[in-house]
Amino acid sequence: MSRLIHLSFVLALLACLTGTISANPIDDDRDRLNQLLSNPEPADDAELLRNTQEAIALYKKHARRTLPGHQVELDLDRDIRAFETENLTVDGLPIQGGVWDLIKKGADKVPDEVKDQAKELAKTTAKALFNKLTEYLKKKISGEDAAKKDT
């Protein structure tokens, strides 16, 4: 019996030392959202894409906790689907090969001015989606935190 008690204390000590147990995941999400918001103008396109994808992940984590059918969530879901189909990535990197090689070859024939306009449109779309998501998440996470404190 004493071995069992000793083993349980050792396991409890190991759990405390690893620090992997989070006391409040909403606080963690709020901290991550604040990190995303602390840099309103990302340094490059890759950072903008990464920040938008992280905001999407936070949205997917918190949006499903509401009743279905809210117009705000429906609009954001539609915008996210459009963004994800236009910005296909694997492990955070743009996909390569296959059909995309054919598209890239065809894109070589497109004037640079059109490419620049398309790139600016993609950046503007990503920024708009990022802003919509972060505004939604600020309200959502603050509301969940307030509701949790009331209980």
Swiss-Prot record:
One of its GO terms (cellular component) is extracellular space. Residues 1-23 form the signal peptide. One of its GO terms (biological process) is response to bacterium. InterPro entries: Turandot. It comes from the Eukaryota. It is found in: Secreted. Keywords: Immunity, Innate immunity, Secreted, Signal. Belongs to the Turandot family. A humoral factor that may play a role in stress tolerance. This is Protein Turandot Z.
